[in-house]
Amino acid sequence: MAVLEKFIELVKIDSPSDPASPTCPSTAMQLDVANHLERVMKEMGVSNVRQKDGYVYGEIPATPGYEDKTAVGFIAHMDTAPEFNGIGVKPQIIENYDGGDVLLAGSGHILSPKDFPVLLGYKGHTLVTTDGTTLLGSDDKAGIAEILEAAEILLQGEIPHGKICLGFPPDE
C-alpha cells in the first residue's frame, strides 16, 4: 500500500483530542487509531508491537552487522486538533494539479492561487485536501503514514540500519 493510501486510511479514522478531558487518551476514538496501527504494524512484520493505554510501540531490528549502531526512533501522534470538526473526514484527491482554483466540494470554499500563491509550486503534483466540512487531520496522520511507509521499506532488508523504534502516542 502506497503512502497516500496509508494516509487516506488514517484520516478517515476519527480521532479528535479533547483538551478538557482528564484522561489519556483524551477521547476513546483515538483508541480506534491505536488498534488500527497495532494491527497494521503486526501485519507488516514490525517486531515487539505492543499497545498500552493508547500508546503503540514497535521495533525494526537492526540488519545483521549493524546491531551495535545507535538506535533511531520515529514518533508521530494520532490525535487531531479539536479546534475544528474532525469527525467524518472526507479527503479530496486532486491528481496532476493544474495550478487553478481548488474547490472544497463539501463547503463550497475555494483555495485560489491568487490568495495562496504557494499552490503554484504544486502544479503537476497530487494534492490532498479536505472537502471543507472538516479538518483533514494531516497533523500528524501524514507523519504516521510516512513512518509506516519507511518501516515497510526498511523491513524489506535491502537498506542496512541499526535498530529502529516506532512510537505513536495519543494526545499531542
Which functions belong to the PLM regions below?
Residues A2-A28, V128-T129:
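N-terminal capping segment at the start of a domain
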Residues L4, I8, N35-E38, I144-E152:
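Predominant activation on well-ordered alpha-helical scaffold segments within soluble catalytic domains
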Residues Y66-P160, F168:
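Active-site metal-coordination/substrate-binding segment of hydrolases
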Residues P19, N48-Q51, P160-K163:
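Flexible, glycine/charged-enriched surface loops at secondary-structure junctions
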Residues P22-K69, G73-I75, D79:
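A non-catalytic alpha/beta surface segment that caps or lines the substrate-entry region
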Residues P170-E172:
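Conserved mixed alpha/beta catalytic, RNA-binding, or beta-rich assembly cores of soluble enzyme
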